[in-house]
Structure formats: structure tokens, C-alpha cells
Amino acid sequence: MSPLDVQHLREATPGCQSGIVHFNPAGASLPSQATLDAIIDQLQREARDGPMEAGEHGAVLVEKARRAAGQLLNAPASAIAFTSSGSTAWSMAFQALGPWQRGDRILVGRHEWGGNLASMEGAVQAGARVEVIPCDDTGAVCPVALDAMIDAHVKLIDLTWLPANGGLINPAQAIGEVARRHGIPYFIDAGQAVGQLPVDVQALHCDVLKSAGRKHLRGPRGTALMYVRPGFLQHLNPAQRDVLSAPWTAEGFDLRDDARRFETSEVSFALLAGLGNALQEANRLGVERIWERVVQISARIREALREIPGISLHDLGTAHSGLIAFNLAGWDAFELKRRLGLKRINIGANGVAYTPLDMQARHLASIARVSVSPFNNAQDIDSLIAALRELRD
């Protein structure tokens, strides 16, 4: 496997030419010029030819994007839906699995995304219980403990694969094997995974998987994708419907028999054109090569951070993603983010709300987070470390 041409990636990314050091793809990544061009081209077509008329060309691009997403996830194109955000995708699938009732059990990892937990509130009000799967000694969700929790009342197993507050990689495939063995629906929040590391929905044994377009896929904001296993569609009854998701037939309005039952007829073809280009770029580069590069860069950053007095890392697990969570003694994480931003170095910062169960369990009020892209280079790392040393002093 040949390494990525990092210089070419940087030259094809306007943000890398602007003087910004971007260590925040876990929030949103820098798009390529080609992705920007795809968005602008569709908008220009709408302005020139008429929005509805240009929609025919846009629809072709959306189907091209759907095939690219299927290729990336090892899924049929018909199993892919596009939505406006990852949280929207997850919430729609969760609500469609209802109705929820008293006694239903929802098993989640301790690192669950806060937005997903918020979407469960309606089920909780109906009498369902959200229960946390115990972690193993490394801090990862434990498949053995999960297996011991299973009974006839478990209606959903839900896992955030790569948490937003650290480098943990949860054992998504092993969790999926437990779910499959017991015949329990299994949802994966892969918002931090898709575009960063290889994702094979067949190997994961998941029924639903979602990801935002703006993170490691390097697509535009306002886009997301969702995989729905074809054989699982019959168990999902979306509350929100329109003429696309439930088209008119001689017998009345009928839900589609593919993942597009979760789409709406009103979409931004321009944004989806950009997402489509980003998906094609990920496929061309090869996510295995992207992941190899991310592992190399993040290992160097972790090593450098450990050498700075006053910095504490918050990694769990044995293998780590390209997200490095840390704190610098004497600094609020959000103020640290702001001060680095003044030096044109972008990082992230999280409070409790994004991953409340894990943050509370570890007594963390906030964390600073550095996340990496394949286009980050040695100069980026040097700038980050030098700035942190300067602020510490």
C-alpha cells in the first residue's frame, strides 16, 4: 500500500494554503477545492437554468453520491439515505423503531453521543429504560458484559463507535456479533469513524449506521448519510413522510422499500453534490491509506504532548483514533481553544453535554481535543506543540 501524497492533498485544499493549522476534523474538516467547485457548479446551474430545471442534473449527482457512499461502506446504494445531519438521521431511525413502551430496554455504551441520548427522552417518558453497558478494564464497552444483560425486553443496542471526547475505538464488530446472535436491533453512531478508518457494515452486523458529511469525509455542513440494512427496513416506520418517502400509488401513499423512506423531497442538490465529490475522493484515496496516515500523525502528537509538563491525556482503550483529548493544567479547555485560535491553530473543546455519561463517570468538566486529517504535516504538529508550550509558560 503506497503512502498518500500529502503535499498534493494540501495543494488541493484551500484551507491549507491560507495559513490555518487545522486540527479539528472531529468537528468539521477542511474541504477540497473540488468539493467546493461541485457545490458552486450546482448553485450556478440553478441560478442560470432555474432551480427546478437544474434539479434534474442535481438528482443525477445525488445518485452518484449514493453509489459512492455504498462503495465506502460496503453496502448497496439502495441502503443509503441522505439527511441534513447525523443527529437527524439517528433520531429518525430511532423514532421509526417505536412505538416504545413501558419495560422496553435500550442498552447504550457509556460514551454515547449526547444528541442520541436526547432523542431517547420520548421513549423514556413512555416507560422505556436506558441502561449503560459496563466497560472493560481499558474503558471500552464490554461485549461480555453486554451478553449478560440480554433478555426479552431489550429492544435496541446502540453504540457510539468512536467517542467525541477521546481516542477510544469501541469494539463495534464484537458488539454486533452479540446483537446478531440474540436478534436485537443494533445502531452505530459512526460520526467520527466514516472517512477516518475502514467501515464495513456487513462485518459490523449493524442494522443502522449514520455519519455526518462534515467530519472526516470532508464534505459540507448540512449533509449526512445513513445506512439501513435492507432486511431491517420492515421494522422501521418513519413518522415523517412526504411524496418522496411515501409516494402515491393506486392504493394510496406507500412507504418506499429502500432507505430513501428517510429522505425528503426538498434537499440541497448543491450540498449533496459536494458530499458526493468528498465521498468519491475518499474512495479514490483509499480509506485504508487515510487511516494509516491518521495513525502515524496522531501517534506523533500524543508522544509530543506527553513531553509537555502539565498536560494530561484522556485516552481510553488499547487502540486509538485520530482524536486526542487532553487538558493543560491551569487552563480552561474552551479558553485554550480560543487562545490557540488567535494563533490560527484550530482545535476543539467539549463540555459534559456531548458525552455526558462518560464525562460524569470520569469527573471531567471539559476537555480540549486535537483531531487529525491526512493532510496535516510535521509543520502543523510543530506549530501546535510550540504554541502549547508558549501558553504553558
Regions found by a protein language model. Give the residues of each.
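Pyridoxal 5′-phosphate
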Residues: 1-393
